């Protein structure tokens, strides 16, 4: 192109007059103050009416040259354009290669593995973002999908805006066809990426639905398990209460059986007392003041009685004598018996050498409340507070206590 004439500087082209890759001053010295791009080589060409071909390309038949060949023609006609370099088609996923169109084509062939790795990393990043949405729940996942669709639309709109910004002001049909081809290619790539993302989101949605179903099932089963556990715990408490009641009843039954085995039904009762030394010490210390014997009866359906022994004495015999009393107990057949109780009572401390038993007897005081029909479990004990001196209990002449054991006998007169 001819060098610029005149002293007025050539203004920069309008921003819509240069396509991408068209340097602003490839062809110098335009004849007009305004310039546009050569339809053949994308180089700057002076605006001179209908002449849209720069002098370097005017010798070529541009109508018969394909877009790819036209680029090679541009490289030959304007090597400075090729030296400027173009980016790799995979720059959007991280490839930083730039060069001439031929070197870019060779780069695409030789760098397929690295491009696949870049695409893989790109997809992993999107998958991670989608995974975050999955962990946050379906609402967050739908929001991520909307964001992706919006971002893809923005990218498409941005690319279209850039293309429009860089669209050549030439009205050449070939250039318009090339631009349309590039736009369609970019749109196809973005649509392909969007379809991939939509497929990924669809799969993740299915997984989310399956997870929600499994979670709902698990929650329902957990609720059933909790209700079952509560029911079993309540049942265990009931069984424990029942078991405690049965243990108590069994204890009473065993005690009753033992008492029945030890009881007599003829008015005569023999009471064996073991650990006499320890029991005397406990009585003297006030720890165990008195001892009760098992119950016995004057007959099978007669009076129910028991003995009460104070090893350290009671009343007038405290600390000096054994005090022995009889206790009228409430029986099952009291309503059929004559009251007050009037049978003679005889106490005996047995000499285990059978030499000299200690004996004391008395007849009931019919006016005493101790011998009236019992209104509680037991009446007040009555008997002999000075039954036997403590000083003679360990006498070597007698065996009232032998092997730390002594025997007391009670005889209730049954004939009236």
From Swiss-Prot:
<dbReference type="GO" id="GO:0042802">
    <property type="term" value="F:identical protein binding"/>
</dbReference>
<dbReference type="GO" id="GO:0043122">
    <property type="term" value="P:regulation of canonical NF-kappaB signal transduction"/>
</dbReference>
<dbReference type="InterPro" id="IPR037306">
    <property type="entry name" value="TRAF1_MATH"/>
</dbReference>
<dbReference type="GO" id="GO:0065003">
    <property type="term" value="P:protein-containing complex assembly"/>
</dbReference>
<keyword id="KW-1017">Isopeptide bond</keyword>
<dbReference type="InterPro" id="IPR049342">
    <property type="entry name" value="TRAF1-6_MATH_dom"/>
</dbReference>
<keyword id="KW-0175">Coiled coil</keyword>
<feature type="modified residue" description="Phosphoserine">
    <location>
        <position position="146"/>
    </location>
</feature>
<dbReference type="GO" id="GO:2001236">
    <property type="term" value="P:regulation of extrinsic apoptotic signaling pathway"/>
</dbReference>
<comment type="subunit">
    <text>Homotrimer. Heterotrimer with TRAF2. Interacts with TNFRSF1A/TNFR1, TNFRSF1B/TNFR2, TNFRSF4, TNFRSF5/CD40, TNFRSF8/CD30, TNFRSF9/CD137, TNFRSF11A/RANK, TNFRSF13C, TNFRSF18/AITR, TNFRSF17/BCMA, TNFRSF19/TROY, TNFRSF19L/RELT, XEDAR, EDAR, Epstein-Barr virus BNFL1/LMP-1, TANK/ITRAF, TRAIP and RIPK2. Interacts with BIRC2 and BIRC3 N-terminus; a single BIRC2 or BIRC3 molecule interacts with a heterotrimer formed by TRAF1 and TRAF2. Interacts with NFATC2IP, TRAFD1 and with HIVEP3. Interacts with MAP3K14. Interacts with GPS2.</text>
</comment>
<keyword id="KW-0832">Ubl conjugation</keyword>
<dbReference type="InterPro" id="IPR032070">
    <property type="entry name" value="TRAF_BIRC3-bd"/>
</dbReference>
<dbReference type="GO" id="GO:0051092">
    <property type="term" value="P:positive regulation of NF-kappaB transcription factor activity"/>
</dbReference>
<keyword id="KW-0597">Phosphoprotein</keyword>
<dbReference type="InterPro" id="IPR008974">
    <property type="entry name" value="TRAF-like"/>
</dbReference>
<feature type="coiled-coil region">
    <location>
        <begin position="182"/>
        <end position="264"/>
    </location>
</feature>
<dbReference type="GO" id="GO:0031625">
    <property type="term" value="F:ubiquitin protein ligase binding"/>
</dbReference>
<feature type="site" description="Cleavage; by CASP8">
    <location>
        <begin position="163"/>
        <end position="164"/>
    </location>
</feature>
<dbReference type="GO" id="GO:0005164">
    <property type="term" value="F:tumor necrosis factor receptor binding"/>
</dbReference>
<dbReference type="GO" id="GO:0031996">
    <property type="term" value="F:thioesterase binding"/>
</dbReference>
<dbReference type="InterPro" id="IPR012227">
    <property type="entry name" value="TNF_rcpt-assoc_TRAF_met"/>
</dbReference>
<dbReference type="GO" id="GO:0008270">
    <property type="term" value="F:zinc ion binding"/>
</dbReference>
<dbReference type="GO" id="GO:0005737">
    <property type="term" value="C:cytoplasm"/>
</dbReference>
<dbReference type="GO" id="GO:0006915">
    <property type="term" value="P:apoptotic process"/>
</dbReference>
<comment type="function">
    <text>Adapter molecule that regulates the activation of NF-kappa-B and JNK. Plays a role in the regulation of cell survival and apoptosis. The heterotrimer formed by TRAF1 and TRAF2 is part of a E3 ubiquitin-protein ligase complex that promotes ubiquitination of target proteins, such as MAP3K14. The TRAF1/TRAF2 complex recruits the antiapoptotic E3 protein-ubiquitin ligases BIRC2 and BIRC3 to TNFRSF1B/TNFR2.</text>
</comment>
<dbReference type="GO" id="GO:0005829">
    <property type="term" value="C:cytosol"/>
</dbReference>
<dbReference type="GO" id="GO:0033209">
    <property type="term" value="P:tumor necrosis factor-mediated signaling pathway"/>
</dbReference>
<dbReference type="InterPro" id="IPR002083">
    <property type="entry name" value="MATH/TRAF_dom"/>
</dbReference>
<dbReference type="Pfam" id="PF21355">
    <property type="entry name" value="TRAF-mep_MATH"/>
</dbReference>
<protein>
    <recommendedName>
        <fullName>TNF receptor-associated factor 1</fullName>
    </recommendedName>
</protein>
<feature type="region of interest" description="Disordered">
    <location>
        <begin position="1"/>
        <end position="24"/>
    </location>
</feature>
<keyword id="KW-0053">Apoptosis</keyword>
<feature type="cross-link" description="Glycyl lysine isopeptide (Lys-Gly) (interchain with G-Cter in ubiquitin)">
    <location>
        <position position="193"/>
    </location>
</feature>
<dbReference type="GO" id="GO:0035591">
    <property type="term" value="F:signaling adaptor activity"/>
</dbReference>
<dbReference type="Pfam" id="PF16673">
    <property type="entry name" value="TRAF_BIRC3_bd"/>
</dbReference>
<feature type="cross-link" description="Glycyl lysine isopeptide (Lys-Gly) (interchain with G-Cter in ubiquitin)">
    <location>
        <position position="185"/>
    </location>
</feature>
<feature type="domain" description="MATH">
    <location>
        <begin position="266"/>
        <end position="412"/>
    </location>
</feature>
